[in-house]
């Protein structure tokens, strides 16, 4: 069974939509969910969501990493080895191999910085890239990077192209994917 860590404190109206969506995923897709965040806020919503018997658990993470966290404060919350915010705890669970994926609706910059400090990076890759699939007339295309790195160097663009190509081949099954460049102006 696929195990997914969900940052229950990530969305604007946390934790209700995060918990309700996680319960729905467990019910409809048969995945195991590990919710990270303040258990005293998560558990009442979980109890009212008819989640009994579903593979949903809570891992208490009492600290918050918010949309307002920036600069040194954000880096400290992401980097500190004893950080107890829902993102740091979630990425640590993933790194230990206790889950297959981590999902957050939280601050994109915080998610990227926390992932870098908690998970590290692939050797030879200077910057991570966000890579959502975009629908097209003939299926989907993958766009790297969608804005987390507005000041890229040529070598970053090359690395994004390589990562996107490998992803398209190995995950999406696209033989000989095309790589192009779109400028944000």
Where are these predicted regions, by residue range?
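A generic membrane alpha-helix/interface feature
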Residues: 25, 48, 124-125, 163
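Short, acidic/small-residue loops that bind anionic groups at enzyme active sites
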Residues: 113-147
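Contiguous, glycine/small-aliphatic-enriched amphipathic segments in soluble metabolic enzymes
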Residues: 1-105, 110-117, 169-182
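Short, charged/polar low-complexity linear motifs in solvent-exposed/disordered segments
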Residues: 33-34, 130, 160-161
């Amino acid at each position: 069974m696929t195990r997914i860590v969900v940052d229950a404190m990530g969305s604007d109206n946390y934790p209700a939509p995060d918990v309700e969506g996680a319960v729905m995923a467990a019910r409809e897709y048969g995945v195991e969910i590990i919710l990270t965040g303040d258990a005293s806020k998560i558990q009442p919503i979980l109890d009212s969501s008819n989640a009994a018997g579903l593979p949903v658990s809570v891992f208490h993470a009492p600290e918050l990493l918010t949309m307002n966290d920036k600069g040194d404060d954000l880096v400290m919350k992401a980097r500190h080895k004893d950080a107890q915010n829902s993102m740091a705890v979630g990425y640590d669970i993933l790194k230990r191999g206790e889950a297959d994926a981590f999902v957050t609706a939280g601050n994109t910059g915080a998610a990227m910085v926390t992932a870098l400090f908690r998970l590290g990076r692939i050797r030879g890759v200077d910057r991570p890239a966000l890579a959502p699939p975009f629908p097209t007339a003939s299926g989907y295309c993958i766009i790297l990077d969608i804005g987390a790195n507005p000041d890229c160097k040529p070598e970053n663009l090359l690395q994004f192209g390589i990562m996107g190509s490998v992803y398209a081949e190995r995950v999406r099954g696209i033989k000989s994917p095309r790589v192009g460049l779109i400028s944000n102006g």
